[in-house]
């Protein structure tokens, strides 16, 4: 399942600028949409929609820091209007998208990667017969 979760994160990254249905992610990794969303929320404490929105806004922030136009970035990351993008960006970052380049402020949401770390345990003696 760990590989499937990481495959899903790779799929999201590859399609951040595309219009895609979130159900396509679960199809891509061959897991039911319901179960994938439940597992994702249990591991991250955020919905899949929130994660995709945060990743898109994070990438948009990078573009704005490099001097890209707000209008271009809004449409590039799937927003239907500049007003909608501006509201979402301000709610997410606390500043207007038009202020990013001037203030040189960057808020980031990194790509998730799922790993298992095992610590502790009991040393077991074994004998091969």
Residue spans of the language-model regions?
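Recognition helices and adjacent regulatory flanks at domain boundaries
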Residues: 1, 9-14, 26-27, 35
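…primarily DNA-binding HTH/wHTH and HhH modules…
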Residues: 1-3, 47, 87-129
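Terminal helix-turn-helix DNA-binding modules in bacterial transcription factors
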Residues: 6-15, 19-23, 42-77, 104-121
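Basic/polar phosphate-binding segments, predominantly the helix-turn-helix DNA-binding elements
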Residues: 19-52, 74-96
């Amino acid at each position: 399942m760990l590989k499937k979760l990481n495959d899903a994160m790779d799929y999201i990254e590859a399609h951040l600028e595309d219009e895609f249905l979130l159900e396509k992610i679960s199809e891509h990794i061959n897991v039911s949409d319901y179960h994938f969303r439940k597992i994702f929320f249990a591991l991250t404490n955020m919905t899949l929609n929130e994660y995709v929105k945060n990743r898109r806004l994070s990438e948009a922030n990078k573009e704005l820091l490099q001097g890209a136009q707000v209008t271009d970035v809004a449409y590039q990351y799937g927003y239907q209007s500049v007003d909608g993008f501006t509201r979402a960006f301000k709610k997410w970052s606390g500043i207007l998208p038009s202020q990013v380049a001037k203030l040189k402020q960057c808020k980031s949401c990194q790509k998730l990667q799922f790993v298992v770390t095992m610590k502790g345990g009991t040393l077991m003696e074994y004998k091969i017969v």
